[in-house]
């Protein structure tokens, strides 16, 4: 017998399972049945594509069996799927690879019911069995191999792994139930209820095996003689699920509850979906899709190793659930099924990535999903829930999917200078509100909505009744928005990198102002040195003394700078342009000041104050405070 230590995070997870997540213990059956179904899917695929397995499994049919023993306080879940060898058991149960227990632990909220719903999303569903088990034995034999193995654990820090004997391929999970759980889960009616609730539309039959006391039928003579029927114990073998490919059934026959139950069985989510999209397509390519959008974004949505939520079938035969190219990455939150009538069963991953049929299915699926999201957008309340969860990946779509760029832009929602806090606007609504002379969409990017709404750069736009989009998700908006270019011929313009809206000032008046302040502009630039690219007078301000802007070239470099930072590489920040308001009292007094020390202090205050107003960092907060103190003292 070989003893193995659990991966550190697994031990931590098992402790959580047994001590924290009490509220929804029944999900362990859902998780183990889903795993059994996946194992059968894999063997079903291999027997049709692997020459070494075709003959041996020609008559094979996948099924799942559940047995229980009230006296023994035990429960067994058995499948005849692909099975596991020694390496598989260590990789699948002894460690957690892709989804990461650390992320699971970090995502825990302290709400036991919510936390139990995270189990499946993080691919740690097997371990949920330790919520109800004193001990678990996993006996498995891999298809095409001779040796079977037994994995055993009490859910503490280690597990045993030993060779054993098993006649056929597949996996048996024997669960020795805790005393307090046996009454609930070693029960025919409870098991049937749980399977019907979570796994009714698993594609393979699920049989419940149990002993039942029955009375033998009496003959007419024995009945007349008053004899009592003899009782005996019969072994029952009852199918307890529908075992149908739900997506192939006509939509007219399916109820919302059918769709919701199936979603829960494939997504490991205990909530109903936000949106269900069921489509059968005929023509050049014939395929059926059943897509779901979850109410809550998948926990791994922003991980590079996110798990694809879409399964590919060919004529009801499972092919893969690990192909991220079935849908574009900006739709990685979508869950569901694609079932093709035209793809070959032995399609390889390389062929999948270049296959014309699959490319057509992908294109058609994307258009359908976007069209259904657009329908959802007509309900403002429901669409606000969608936007709260998925606006970021949708924005990625603008960058990734030129074909559907316009359709995606119609789905985007933005905060703006004319919307209340918590409300958002579409680009179409923005256009409709604009005055007849406006032919551009103006925006400002930053990290804090309140700071952006109070930015001095908005002053001239408010004065001219021009709406500005408030983009407070800088991490993505700084990259994506410049790439949009235009929406229905209206160009996107960053107000930090363009001239302000027209003001009632002739060229002659403008020139006169510049000449009047030429000397002080030169002095300010000299005092600030490399901290600024230039110093100018501006007409964009009505209340603030100064602001900072970028020139057009620097605005284009912002996205590149962000990408460099994301890769951990430094890229020097471009110095801003400082603009001062010639109508402001501070600037007027500064223009007539002869004290060089005061000019230097005020110059730096104008720059640092402008940067703070845009949510930017200032290089020397101590010096800023000292300058303010000196200027305040002089003013008293």
Swiss-Prot record:
Classification via InterPro entries: HATPase_C_sf, HSP90_C, Hsp90_fam, Hsp90_N, Ribosomal_Su5_D2-typ_SF
Highest taxon in the source lineage: Bacteria
Annotated stretches, region: C: 563-636
Organism per entry: Aliarcobacter butzleri (strain RM4018)
Sequence similarity: Belongs to the heat shock protein 90 family.
UniProt xrefs under PANTHER family: HEAT SHOCK PROTEIN 90 FAMILY MEMBER (PTHR11528)
Job description of the protein: Molecular chaperone. Has ATPase activity.
UniProt name for this protein: Chaperone protein HtpG
């Amino acid at each position: 017998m070989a003893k193995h230590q659990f991966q550190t995070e697994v031990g931590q997870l098992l402790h959580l399972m047994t001590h924290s997540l009490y509220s929804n213990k029944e999900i362990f059956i859902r998780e183990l049945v889903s795993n059994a179904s996946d194992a059968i899917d894999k063997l079903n695929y291999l027997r049709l594509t692997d020459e070494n397995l075709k003959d041996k499994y020609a008559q094979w049919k996948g099924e799942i069996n559940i047995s229980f023993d009230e006296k023994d306080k035990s429960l067994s879940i058995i499948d005849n799927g692909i099975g596991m060898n020694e390496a598989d058991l260590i990789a699948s149960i002894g460690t957690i690879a892709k989804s990461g227990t650390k992320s699971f632990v970090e995502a825990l909220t302290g709400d036991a019911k919510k936390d139990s719903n995270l189990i499946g999303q993080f691919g740690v569903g097997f371990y949920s069995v330790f919520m109800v088990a004193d001990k678990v034995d996993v006996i498995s034999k891999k298809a095409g191999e001779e040796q079977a193995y037994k994995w055993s654990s009490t859910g503490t820090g280690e597990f045993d792994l030993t060779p054993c004997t098993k006649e056929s391929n597949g996996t048996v999970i024997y669960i020795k139930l805790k005393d307090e759980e046996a009454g609930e889960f070693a029960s025919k009616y409870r098991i049937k209820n749980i399977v019907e609730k979570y796994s009714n539309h698993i594609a393979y039959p699920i049989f419940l095996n149990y002993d039942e006391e029955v009375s033998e039928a009496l003959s007419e003579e024995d009945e007349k003689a008053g004899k009592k029927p003899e009782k005996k114990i019969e072994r029952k073998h009852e199918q307890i699920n529908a075992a149908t490919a739900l997506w192939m059934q006509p939509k007219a026959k399916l109820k919302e509850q059918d769709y919701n139950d199936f979603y829960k069985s494939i997504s490991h989510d205990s909530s109903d979906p936000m949106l269900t999209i069921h489509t059968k397509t005929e023509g050049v390519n014939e395929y059926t899709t059943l897509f779901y959008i979850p109410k809550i974004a998948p926990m791994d949505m922003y991980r590079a190793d996110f798990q694809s939520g879409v399964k590919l079938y060919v004529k009801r035969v499972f092919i893969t659930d690990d192909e991220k190219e079935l849908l574009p990455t900006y739709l990685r939150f979508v869950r569901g099924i694609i079932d093709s009538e035209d793809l070959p069963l032995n399609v390889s991953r390389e062929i999948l990535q270049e296959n014309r049929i699959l490319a057509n299915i992908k294109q058609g699926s994307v258009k359908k999903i976007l069209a259904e999201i657009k329908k959802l957008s007509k309900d403002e309340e429901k669409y606000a829930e969608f936007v709260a969860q998925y606006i970021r990946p949708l924005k990625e779509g603008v960058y990734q999917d030129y074909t559907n760029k316009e359709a995606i832009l119609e789905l985007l929602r933005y905060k703006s200078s004319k919307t209340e806090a918590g409300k958002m606007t579409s680009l179409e609504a923005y256009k409709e509100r604009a005055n007849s002379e406006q032919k551009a969409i103006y925006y400002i990017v930053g990290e804090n909505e309140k700071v952006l709404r109070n930015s001095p750069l908005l002053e001239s736009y408010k004065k001219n009744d021009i709406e500005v989009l408030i983009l407070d998700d800088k991490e993505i908006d700084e990259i994506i928005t410049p790439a949009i270019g235009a929406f229905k011929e209206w160009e996107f313009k960053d107000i930090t990198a363009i001239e302000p809206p027209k003001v009632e000032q002739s060229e002659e008046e403008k020139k006169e102002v510049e000449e009047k302040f030429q000397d002080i502009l030169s002095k300010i630039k000299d005092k600030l040195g490399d901290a600024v690219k230039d110093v100018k007078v501006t007409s964009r301000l009505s209340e603030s003394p100064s602001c900072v802007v970028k020139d057009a070239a620097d605005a284009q470099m912002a996205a590149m700078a962000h990408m460099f930072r994301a890769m951990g590489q430094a890229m020097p920040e471009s110095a801003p342009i400082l603009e001062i308001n010639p109508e402001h009292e501070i600037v007027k007094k500064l223009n007539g000041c002869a004290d060089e020390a005061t000019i230097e202090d005020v110059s730096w205050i104008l720059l640092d104050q402008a940067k703070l107003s845009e949510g930017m960092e200032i290089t020397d907060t101590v010096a800023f405070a000292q300058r303010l103190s000196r200027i305040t003292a002089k003013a008293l």
